[in-house]
Amino acid sequence: ILQAASQLLCQKTFAAMTMDDVADAVGIAKASLYKHFSSKDDLCCAAVVQMLSQVRAYLETLEPEAAPLEKLRAVVRWSLQRLLAQEIPEWPGSHSPLRTMLREHHDCLIEWLPVSQCLEQWIAQAQQQGALDAALPPRVVLHILYARACDPAAGFLQDAGLYDNAEIVELVLRTSFDGLAARASAAEL
């Protein structure tokens, strides 16, 4: 049920998804679905909690000795790969009822907090090492990385068909971590 809800969140968004859609995707009666989840809100929150637990599990697979910047890049890479495979949805916009609901849902906050703390720790370490701009507040960097991990631009690039998914991931990583400014060529150095 949660997998179907996640897929539908990716394909249709929260506003367009219905409990009928989920019941049809799972192959059960709508009444049976309501035995598990009392509302679409509860179902979608449970799907997001499951996704966040997958993120936490992924964080635990990263080598503790790896450089903090490399761990941050790995998390964004992993998230973008999941986004392009429609395994995780784009993050809802600021006016989305889903975003408001997720911010108020206890289980979402319980899953979200350790992820944010881990990423903020890596951000602070990367700043101390000079790998990230230390003038930027860590919370700003955190939210920029969250935005990149659920960036609709990746989907736009995918829809255009000019790049394969691996190229899109690398392009988003490059613009996110290296910026848009022109680089000095080897001849200029």
Predicted regions and their residues:
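A short, glycine- and basic residue-enriched loop/turn
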Residues: 16, 31, 40-41, 91
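Short helix/strand-capping hinge loops at secondary-structure junctions
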Residues: 8-17, 37
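Short hydrophobic/aromatic patch on the recognition helix
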Residues: 27-37
